Design a protein with these regions (language model features):
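Beta-sheet repeat architectures centered on beta-propellers
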Residues: 13-19, 23-27, 33-286
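Surface-exposed extracellular loop regions of Gram-negative outer-membrane beta-barrel proteins
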Residues: 1-10
């Protein structure tokens, strides 16, 4: 009898690229041409709220450039891929396996060029490389790769410090996180709840920021929209700068749908998001 054998456990779920899979505590996660999957004894399709955003903008010619990276310090699996407007890796989609549930899967998307990745189990911190087409091996007056005109790979250590260090110079690690649009519902006394779904105008008079930790300033933006086809626009008084001593922000924002964005753009800035509170009430139409 054969000691080892291969048994197929699924169809239409194969790897999109040879480096698009990663193993976490006995469970394998991977990116396919048809979505995201995992196998820990049985095949499962991962519910993904950003699937259309990723696959509608995926450069299918460069599928083999897709690579997966595990950041076990924060329970994250990253898939780095090439968007339709690029020829090199430039975007990332991240799944948080620590905090996700079937009812509430946690996904984020971002812009990040990483062509190889190894997690903290090897060096204590995640290490990764970036392919930079704008650099030809010259740093200052020194040339490290003679005759190169095709770009170089730059080696990074992640989760260290507050700034990016590249070629001896520090720059800001620009970061942001934005919620989806939210609206309000109105419950009538003695009657059924009337769902919002953009029917009611709402007014946000103030925001109480809550950061679990913060270094430097952060920026809060309320993006407003009255109709689904409207372009998001910041509230008239925003964006708002939040310092470590900010207790509340008076906003005077008004719309049918609002999303909250937290960001930073300068060096030596860091924040870890807590639970923000917003003073919201129904408002009349004009």
């Amino acid at each position: 009898p054969f000691t080892f054998a291969f048994e197929q456990v699924g169809t239409n779920c194969g790897l999109i690229g040879k480096n698009a899979a990663v193993e976490v505590d006995g469970t394998v996660y991977w990116m396919s041409e048809n979505g995201f999957f995992r196998y820990g004894g049985q095949l499962e399709s991962l519910p993904c709220l950003v699937e259309d955003f990723v696959f509608d903008d995926l450069n299918t010619v460069t599928k083999q450039h897709v690579n997966a990276g595990l950041n076990n310090l924060f329970g994250e699996i990253n898939w780095f891929y090439v968007s339709s407007g690029s020829n090199t890796v430039n975007r990332v989609v991240t799944y948080n396996y620590f905090d996700s549930s079937i009812q509430r899967p946690i996904w984020t998307t971002g812009t990040l060029n990483r062509t190889a990745w190894t997690d903290s189990a090897v060096f204590g911190k995640p290490h990764a490389t970036e392919y930079d087409t704008s650099t030809n091996g010259t740093v200052g007056s020194a040339t490290y790769v003679q005759g190169n005109s095709d770009g170089v790979s730059i080696y990074y250590e992640h989760e260290k410090g507050l700034n990016q260090v590249k070629e001896g110079a520090e720059s800001a690690i620009a970061a942001n996180i934005e919620s989806g649009d939210f609206d309000i519902s109105i419950t009538k006394e003695g009657g059924a709840s009337t769902k919002g779904d953009g029917e009611f105008m709402m007014k946000i008079s103030r925001v109480i920021p809550d950061f679990l930790s913060q270094t430097g300033d952060a920026t809060i933006t309320l993006n407003l929209r009255d109709f689904p086809t409207d372009v998001e626009a910041s509230s008239a008084l925003g964006p708002f700068t939040v310092t470590t001593s900010t207790k509340k922000i008076d906003t005077r924002a008004r719309a049918r749908a609002i999303s909250l964005k937290v960001s930073n753009t300068s060096t030596s800035q860091f924040w870890k998001l807590g639970t923000f509170r917003l003073d919201i009430q129904p408002d009349g139409r004009r």
